[in-house]
Each structure stands twice: as C-alpha cells, then as structure tokens.
Design a protein with these regions (language model features):
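Beta->alpha loop/short-helix hinge microenvironment recognizer with preference
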Residues: 1-393
C-alpha cells in the first residue's frame, strides 16, 4: 500500500470519484462539481499563453474552473466580495450569531435542500427582525448578513446559519439606536422564537405536500411519525451561539472573510492518501477543540464532500434589513452620517484578473519573470497553427 503525504482534494477526486460515481449515480450538479474539481487548472478550461517581447520567454497559465465548491477557486471571489462590503460597513459594534437545528431534522432537510435551506433563512431573519423591533430589546430596524454552512469539522452533515448582525439600527424616527455594549437579544429567547418559526414553516410545507422523503427520511412520510418528530424537536433546546462583539470596520471586513467563501474542507487539512483511504484533520470538540487525525475510505470522503454541494443557483450569502440591496444605498448612508464615520471605498471594483493579482499579491503578470520585458499574447501564425484563443483567467 502506497501512502501519499502531499496530496490535495483534486488528487482525492481523481483517485476515488470514478468508482464513487459508478456505485452511487450522483445527480447532475454533483457530477459537474466533480468534473470542475478534477479539471481545474489542467488546461481543460482553456489557457492563457503570453510571450515576452524582448527575450521570447513563453508563459502558459491554465485557467481555473471557477466552481464555488473548488478549493482552488475561492480566493478571488472572496476578496472581491469582501472589498465590495467595505462600502456598507459602519464603525459600530457587530455580533456573530449562529442558528442551528437538531440533528433529528437532518434527513428531512437533506431530502429537501432548496426548500428547507430557504426555511432556515426565513426563520433566522424573521426571528432577528421581530425581536429587534421589540422596544424591550432594541426597538429598531437592524441590518445583518446570513451565510449557510452545511458541514461540521469532520464533513458530517450539520446545516446552520452564520449571521453577522449590526449592533444597532434605525428607530421609527430614523434615529440611530445602539445596543449599549452587549448583545441586545437573550440567547434563550432567540432559540425559542427561531425554533417556533422554523417548525411552523416545516409543518406548512408538510400540509401543502411539498416535502420529499428519501433514504432515512422515508419513515416521516407517515403522519404519526412526522408528528412525533415535530414534538421531539419542540421539546429540545435549540442551540443558538453568539460570539463577543468586534468593533471597527476593518475588523468586520476581515472577520467576514472567514465565513463567506469557505467550503467543507480545504487542501491543507488533507494529510495523506493511500489506495483506499484518506486521512485528514478534524476538530475534536469533546476535547477542547483540539485537532486530531481521522481516516476514512476514499469513497466515503467523496460522499461527505458531495453532501455540501449546494443546489443549483442557490444563493448562500443573503443580506437583510439595512444591508439589503433595496435599503443599503440610502439607509447605510444615513446611518453613516448619524454616526459620523467615513465611507470605505472599494479598491477592487471593476478590476480584471491581471489588475487584481497586482493589487492583492504585488505581482505583475504582464512583466516577464526572466528579463522584466512586456508579456503579450502570441501571434497565431508565428507560434502554432492550432493556437487556442487567448482567454482571460
């Protein structure tokens, strides 16, 4: 048995995905994701070829797949998204709130991903809006960003919503109202309201016969079993987690980057691979969050990864309240004027890939790495009769 210690998610897919596909017949969007990951930066998506005008040095760059599930394609979208948020971030307190659901609901949620992921957003936003408008908590309209994650550290199925909440808002007189240094909503109240709203939507979808039941969820087609499930979920305390506040616009922007374009697992967590297994590191929350190695079969690794491929065209990052697309242009400007804070200007807006590389990494790909001359697209007739069209990365 040969063990490879320097390997990536792409390597794992190349070795184990073909057999996984034969055994499991995955849906089309899973097959597309696998194709993208296996072929990213291999030339399958086109190439950029450039030639130095002075020394003739040739540079070939394989294009990336741009899949939102590919570990090699998240940096540019993340940097552009975070940069765009600078214009809407205020120098005010922010809070990180996490909404989770009991594991008993996992099988039904996985069988109805689009519907019940949407329901998570609906319940979380309705909870925050309702409680924030209550005068005994804040009495204001707030702004927040919701981001869906579906994984735990071991790539187990664990759907939850990360929410970045502005620690203040506009009251009925359009005046700024702040939280006063601590989170304005009691965790117990958030948990109960969120539980009620999510289960209400789940019941409504059941009553309208919109739910599907596959695999271990099939038993809940029976109305009595479904009612038992709801009763059990009503009895449980749903975990709502809130991190301490973080102040300052730059801190908020940096913090956002940890959650917005994350995927189920990154390359640096893959430790080794054999002909049949993959070893990666996971957080052991029963042991104070220490990292430990976990070894599973290659096909099981693929199965776990594929659980977290979002439905086609699903929007994972959503803005609400003062930060919604409809409100942020006027209301964030008004809030900024009330708070007396400066506007942060986007630096990456309208930049192409070459310009972004220069700004982010201080590398000028238009200059030859050998002599410093200008790199240009080669002439088709000079270098190859079958030269591929020049494509932007």
């Amino acid at each position: 048995m040969i063990m490879e210690k320097s390997c990536t998610i792409q390597d794992v897919f190349e070795r184990f995905y073909p057999s996984y596909e034969k055994r499991n017949n995955p849906p089309a969007h899973h097959r597309k994701t696998a194709y993208h990951i296996m072929n990213c930066k291999t030339g399958a998506f086109g190439v950029n070829i450039s030639v130095c005008e002075d020394c003739g040095c040739i540079s070939i760059h394989n294009n990336s797949c741009r899949s939102r599930c590919c570990p090699m394609c998240q940096e540019f979208p993340k940097e552009k998204w975070i940069d765009a948020q600078k214009e809407n971030v205020l120098d005010a307190p922010y809070y990180h709130v996490v909404f989770t659901v009991p594991e008993e609901l996992n099988s039904i949620i996985y069988s109805n991903q689009k519907l019940l992921y949407d329901a998570l957003y609906h319940a979380a936003s309705a909870t925050l809006n309702e409680l924030a408008k209550d005068a005994k908590y804040l009495g204001a309209n707030i702004g927040y960003i919701c981001i869906l994650h579906t994984w735990g550290s071991a790539m187990n199925y664990h759907p939850h919503i990360h929410t970045i909440v502005l620690g203040g808002g506009l009251d009925d007189e359009n005046k700024w109202k702040e939280t006063g240094g601590k989170f304005f909503l009691p965790y117990g109240v958030i948990s109960k309201v969120f539980r009620g709203k999510y289960l209400d939507e789940l019941k409504s979808l059941w009553n309208d016969s919109k739910l599907k039941f596959h695999g271990t969820a099939e038993k809940y087609q029976n109305s009595y079993r479904f009612k038992e499930l709801l009763d059990k979920c009503y009895e449980k305390n749903w975990v709502t987690y809130c991190k301490e506040t973080f102040n300052g616009a730059q801190s908020v922007i940096n913090y956002l980057g940890k959650y917005t374009h994350r995927i189920a697992i990154s390359n640096h967590r893959i430790k080794s691979m054999t002909d049949t297994t993959v070893t990666y590191v996971v957080k052991d929350y029963k042991n104070e969050g220490c990292w430990k190695e976990k070894t599973i079969s290659g096909e099981e690794f693929i199965r776990r990864f594929m659980m977290h491929v979002p439905p086609k065209r699903f929007v994972r990052i959503r803005h609400y309240g003062l930060l919604s697309c409809r409100n942020k242009r006027k209301k964030i400007t008004h809030c900024r004027n009330l708070l007396g804070c400066k506007k942060y200007i986007s630096t990456l807006k309208n930049l192409n890939a070459v310009e972004m590389i220069k700004v982010l990494y201080h590398i000028d790909v238009c200059k030859c790495s050998s002599c410093g001359g200008n790199m240009v697209s080669p002439r088709k007739d000079k270098y190859s009769s079958s030269f591929r069209a020049h494509m932007r990365c």
